A protein has these predicted regions:
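Substrate-binding cleft and catalytic face of glycoside hydrolase catalytic domains
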Residues: 90-268, 272-274, 343-351
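Bacterial Sec-dependent N-terminal signal peptides
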Residues: 17-49
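Generic structural signal for well-ordered alpha-helices
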Residues: 50-54, 88, 139-146, 190-197, ...
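Bacterial N-terminal signal peptides
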Residues: 9-16
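Boundary/entry segment of secreted carbohydrate-active catalytic domains
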Residues: 37-98
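Aromatic-rich peripheral "rim/lid" segments of glycoside hydrolase catalytic domains that contact
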Residues: 103, 223-224, 228-243, 321-337, ...
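Hydrophobic faces of well-ordered beta-strands that scaffold small-molecule active sites
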Residues: 64-70, 89-93, 153-157, 215-219, ...
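Noncatalytic carbohydrate-binding groove/subsite architecture in carbohydrate-active enzymes
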Residues: 56, 62-63, 69, 75-80, ...
Length: 424
């Protein structure tokens, strides 16, 4: 009798323990299921379910690169990186390779003991920040991601009126002091350009068997005035212009870039509204000034690429005006990168634009990509070699309210199909 009671008691304990275990197991699986649902809801894969832009335009040999502008913090995100690799071959950092990021450690000033001697190619002796005062971490991290994922990169940008610390232009790197002379600024420019190219070359040598990751750089960006005239075409409100009063800083930048960049790295001038009247003529003058120093025996220049930003609208510019711009750049013996492509609706003033009508936007993208193919680079002619979209999805675009891109929340828009259909 006692034995039976013991058996019954053991059985009851076993059943109770089993029930508790199932109940506890049910509890622990609930958060896991919830996490999975949340992940699926937040990571849309719809842009991965359509034909890749790369397969249509790069794998077929039409262009060398299709690229996207991406903030450094977003690139490692699984859904973004996967889509960039699927649709493109190249990225451009929106901000992290600009001077204010790289010069950030001395943007508020620098101590005397953090300076070292530098002698320019023209024999000018100056003090410059030690290399440890340059912030290359975001650039290095991005090069590593590109290397690990088979991507290339456009460097953006070395010389620009914006996003460059004022300290870089001032005596003793002190923003409260006056500007340095053009002679000293020229030496500082050389030091900075040399530092960037030397760092990237060293990184690629150490971490990528010397193979190039950054295949092109925007050497000078947006130096032409929006109100350009035949006699005055340079942007005159910049610190660069305040010191030089002429285009010498543009030409010297391409001379120093040619001296320090690997020969396979393409050197570009980049601007917006590049097709427009006197601004376009100013662009052509800059190209001529750079080319004029091509055979300089002491410091030859080089320019390979005319960068057309192409922040355009569905009704502007006219296709004739845009095509003429392309033809004029090719006639200078340059290849072309479409560097920052997006298409909004009409302009409302300032940096405000109407939302693009979906069908008009699709039609415009379609017309552009037909035009780009018409003027693509061939064995015998210069031409367009790559197109970079300035962003991935509308909600993260700098002009997000105007819906300028091919994807919205990672879902393809009619504009995407306009791009794909242009190749068919």
């Amino acid at each position: 009798m006692k034995k039976s009671k013991i058996i019954i008691l053991i059985t009851l304990i076993t059943l109770t323990f089993s029930a508790c275990t199932k109940k506890e197991s049910s509890k622990t699986t609930t958060p896991e299921t919830k996490t999975t649902v949340e992940k699926n809801e937040s990571v849309s894969t719809t842009w991965m379910d359509v034909t890749s832009i790369k397969s249509v335009y790069v794998d077929t040999g039409i262009f060398e690169h299709i690229g996207f502008a991406v903030p450094a913090a977003n690139l490692p995100k699984e859904n973004i990186l996967a889509g960039v690799k699927y649709h493109g071959t190249s990225i451009t950092l929106e901000n992290e390779s600009k001077p204010d990021t790289i010069m950030w450690p001395f943007s508020k000033g620098i101590k005397e003991e953090e300076l070292e001697d530098f002698t320019s190619s023209k024999g000018v002796k100056i003090k410059v920040p030690v290399q440890s005062k340059l912030n290359f971490a975001p650039l290095d991290n991005t090069m590593k991601i590109c290397r690990d994922n088979g991507l290339k990169m456009r460097g953006h940008v070395l010389v620009w009126h914006s996003q460059t610390p004022k300290t870089f232009f001032c005596e003793d790197y002190n923003a409260s002091k006056g500007f340095v002379s053009a002679k000293e600024m020229d030496a500082r420019q050389e030091w900075y350009i040399k530092s960037v190219f030397q760092h990237t070359k060293d990184w690629e040598a150490k971490n990528n068997n010397g193979n190039i990751i950054i295949y092109a750089w925007d050497i000078v960006n947006e130096a032409i005035s929006d109100n350009a005239s035949a006699s005055a075409y340079l942007r005159d409100g910049s610190n660069w212009y305040a010191i030089y009063k002429n285009a010498d800083f543009i030409v010297s930048a391409f001379q120093y870039a040619n001296k320090y960049a690997p020969k396979e790295v393409l050197l570009a001038y980049n601007d917006y509204n590049e097709f427009q009247g006197e601004k376009h003529n100013g662009y052509l003058k800059i190209i001529d000034l750079i080319l004029a120093e091509k055979n300089n025996p002491e410091l030859p220049s080089r320019i390979d690429i005319a960068g057309m930003q192409s922040h355009n609208q569905t009704g502007w510019p006219s296709m004739i005006e845009y095509e003429t711009c392309i033809k004029n750049f090719i006639a200078k013996g340059l290849d072309i990168h479409i560097t920052e492509l997006d298409i909004t609706g009409s302009w409302k003033g300032g940096n405000n634009f109407n939302k693009a009508d979906p069908e008009a936007q699709k039609r415009t993208y379609n017309q552009y990509f037909k035009l780009y193919q018409k003027y693509r680079k061939t064995e015998n002619t210069n031409g367009i070699t790559g197109i970079t979209f300035w962003g991935i999805t509308d909600e993260n675009s700098w002009r997000g309210n105007a819906s300028p891109l091919l994807f919205n929340h990672f879902e393809p828009k009619p504009a995407y199909y306009g791009v794909i259909e242009a190749a068919n």
